């Protein structure tokens, strides 16, 4: 009797130990600056590629980014499931007073130092450490050695990828999936963000950029079928933030009108969020001057709202300036960000007309999330999610155990065909039951 009971208990233990879902391949798209309403129900009527994806998969109402609603902080929140103050990538421009090193939009040599990147482990590092094969195309940071690890393949971002680059990346990613060379492929596309900055979020140029993405999405769904990948490949599409209109004629805050810039030890960033390090002995003077400036809010580090999940960041400055929506903070008029024309002369052609970085609860800062594939429901609309929630979902469909994170599994589990399945990794109740059963087996032995 004991022997039969032991066999039954062993079978139960083994069944509980199995992963909740089969491990499948994952293709991820990061569409920079793609605002939620760019694929509203009305907009989808003229976007057949996205419309097909929505009908075949999951679409959330909107995605709330982390504060600040800038690119690098949200790149890392997406891939770690952690808020900015946890993973430490707190801006597009950062400064470390201890080493006098700067992170400048990832383009300067010091931006590749482990100092900025080793605060958390992104998904591609976790997968690579697990001997999984990762291919990344233009993804910012894939060229950096993080925690001693690089992905299997990184096509480094050096300039804005063209539409042809994007098409080739999608086709190449599907080819390496088909040949068994990749378990995860991640593709970054920037044109929607670029056109939104240059011409504004409602401009024809921005709309043309979305249509260009839509065309590639339509080809992608066709190519997946042609390569017979539809039963083994999940696709997840998200953005890092939205975009809002800005005005250069009457909504610019020039700091040199209020403070002596020589009283600053360091200044980083311009636009919606600016970081100030006052010179020794100048903190109170600078604070009292800038806090009277209209159309922006000034926070001492300890007073930053907790809902931003920002103030505990290692590289957060003593004073943070946050502009009202549509306003732009800069050192002086000479520092306004002209954009260059495409002619040989490369002369400044005009000011930019769109920006992001504002309060993450603003409607214009909302991003997108779409997913389809064998693990996802079809024609399913989900409630809003937050940028940190996506990490757990990616871990789930790739079959890896997530690291500790700030995401909510309850907000994303409804998207899966098997919503009753456990969160990534063994659920606590199952783990406890397995332990009890193992003890019983030991007693019966």
Swiss-Prot record:
A lipid is attached at residue 421 (GPI-anchor amidated serine). Residues 1-22 form the signal peptide. Inhibited by EDTA and EGTA in vitro. Zn(2+) 2 binds at residues 193, 197, 356. Keywords: Cell membrane, Disulfide bond, Glycoprotein, GPI-anchor, Hydrolase, Lipid degradation, Lipid metabolism, Lipoprotein, Membrane, Metal-binding, Phosphoprotein, Signal, Zinc. Its EC number is 3.1.4.-, 3.1.4.38. Choline-specific glycerophosphodiesterase that hydrolyzes glycerophosphocholine (GPC) and lysophosphatidylcholine (LPC) and contributes to supplying choline to the cells. Has a preference for LPC with short (12:0 and 14:0) or polyunsaturated (18:2 and 20:4) fatty acids. In vitro, hydrolyzes only choline-containing lysophospholipids, such as sphingosylphosphorylcholine (SPC), platelet-activating factor (PAF) and lysoPAF, but not other lysophospholipids. Homodimer; disulfide-linked. Homotetramer. This is Glycerophosphocholine choline phosphodiesterase ENPP6. It comes from Bos taurus (Bovine). The lineage of its organism: Eukaryota, Metazoa, Chordata, Craniata, Vertebrata. The gene is ENPP6.
